[in-house]
Amino acid sequence: MRKSSIRRRATAFGTAGALVTATLIAGAVSAPAASAAPADGHGHGHGHGRSWDREARGAAIAAARAARAGIDWEDCAADWNLPKPIQCGYVTVPMDYAKPYGKQIRLAVDRIGNTGTRSERQGALIYNPGGPGGSGLRFPARVTSKSAVWANTAKAYDFVGFDPRGVGHSAPISCVDPQEFVKAPKADPVPGSEADKRAQRKLAREYAEGCFERSGEMLPHMTTPNTARDLDVIRAALGEKKLNYLGVSYGTYLGAVYGTLFPDHVRRMVVDSVVNPSRDKIWYQANLDQDVAFEGRWKDWQDWVAANDAAYHLGDTRAEVQDQWLKLRAAAAKKPLGGVVGPAELISFFQSAPYYDSAWAPTAEIFSKYVAGDTQALVDAAAPDLSDTAGNASAENGNAVYTAVECTDAKWPANWRTWDRDNTRLHRDHPFMTWANAWMNLPCATWPVKQQTPLNVKTGKGLPPVLIVQSERDAATPYEGAVELHQRFRGSRLITERDAGSHGVTGLVNPCINDRVDTYLLTGGTDARDVTCAPHATPRP
């Protein structure tokens, strides 16, 4: 699932990266030559081996073409809202890599040069924040905002962001009118009857049909392997012989696929908050695993709220805080707050807390105000802003890309009985997110284009050590995913932040992690063994 952001309040997604912004459709809750084939030599992906060979040849052609063309850098358009001296441009790629001379699309990229001397420069560091559906164009702003965490790395690298295919300024796709997408209140994601389930199934089917009607030409090509090929073309357009890459959340899966397809094109790769790359997890089982992890992190937040009852007055035990949540949820189900905030919108707002420690105090404060009688604070935080047409279009686009990539990347159960069985079972013990997540992904059950077989992620010849960073109690990308990728990428190193659960670790202040990320990016060096770091500072009320 993705983080929901119908509400217009700042979240950590723009900086730490994540499964990034969106809203559930019904539950709201958000250079070197290209390698010839996958590292295992078999067609584990788009059909069969011949298809992979055609796409690999197409990627090589596109990369060579981009290397010759380069990028025409210029000041960014005013509506991109990127401060100078950040520069913007486009890279042209095939829509279908099996047809490299066929229809082309343009990918938006931006950059800021390294802050150190020419002799200190090591190349470009390309970033993906996650999603699928997240824009990386804010990455160079870490330099203009003088982020202390990234100051050392910025001396050595140009910071480069991009909008992946289908996102933002890169041939954007859409599945529904944005203003319709954000209307509230949406149906309660927890079904109270079989009729409720039928209604949600109808919405999911109509959403999938809308994706095909509005963006059908792009849908078959909205896959992680194609985005990885795009990434290699961007590398070539930048004039980089090898890729330096930072990927967070879904960006870790993009990195894993890139490292499998182009192992000898990787120079440095940091993956933070890792999607489990196992083929039997992508993507149906991965979302079920999230439901369990979100419940655990939700309880962590409730424990923290209870420990700070003097500040929030929501109860001094987890059970009391949960009781307040259930009362709020029931009240919103009976009569939506302000006419627009029902249970779906509440989940959209409150899920920030399981995602990020930085949201713990703000979420608790607004919850506390509601219990004390200030309903408006919660309405302002959780309700959509229909006047924000640009933001709503971005949210709808992000959700469309999320759905398109996850539904096309892999095969999903087409039988409703499977979904009903699995989510009914999970909801009993993990009620916070289960049904909301299910409805968000249900369009994949009736997806109108061919669903692929995920790549077998593994080490290929030439892949250097990859640095993996993960918090132990991450809800969006459970810890087991980092362990799985660590096992698949030989020579990789795993840094674990114990007793912590924020999603997106490299952007937090934790010297045990920050110093090792700097060392790796600046020298390629890693510890002789995996490292466990103490958690970053606990939030304060």
UniProtKB/Swiss-Prot annotation:
Encoding gene per record: tap
Enumerate the propeptide ranges: 37-39
One cellular-component annotation, GO: extracellular region
Q: What is its EC number?
A: 3.4.14.-
Query: Could you say which protein family the record assigns here?
Result: Belongs to the peptidase S33 family.
Q: What is this protein called?
A: Tripeptidyl aminopeptidase
Main role?
Cleaves tripeptides from the N-termini of proteins. Does not cleave mono- or dipeptides, or N-terminally blocked peptides.
> Where in the cell is the protein located?
Secreted
Q: Which residues form the AB hydrolase-1 domain?
A: 123-501
Q: Which Gene3D superfamilies match?
A: alpha/beta hydrolase
* GO biological process, alphabetically ordered: proteolysis
Which segment of the chain is annotated as a signal peptide?
1-36
Q: Which GO terms describe its molecular function?
A: tripeptide aminopeptidase activity
Keywords of the record, alphabetical order, are: Aminopeptidase, Hydrolase, Protease, Secreted, Signal
Q: Does the keyword Membrane apply?
A: no
The residues annotated as the active site are 249, 474, 503
Concerning PANTHER family, the annotation shows: 2-SUCCINYL-6-HYDROXY-2,4-CYCLOHEXADIENE-1-CARBOXYLATE SYNTHASE, TRIPEPTIDYL AMINOPEPTIDASE
Q: Tell me the InterPro entries matching this sequence.
A: AB_hydrolase_fold, Pept_S33_TAP-like_C, Serine_prot/Carboxylest_S33
Q: Which SUPFAM superfamilies match?
A: alpha/beta-Hydrolases
Domain of life of the source: Bacteria
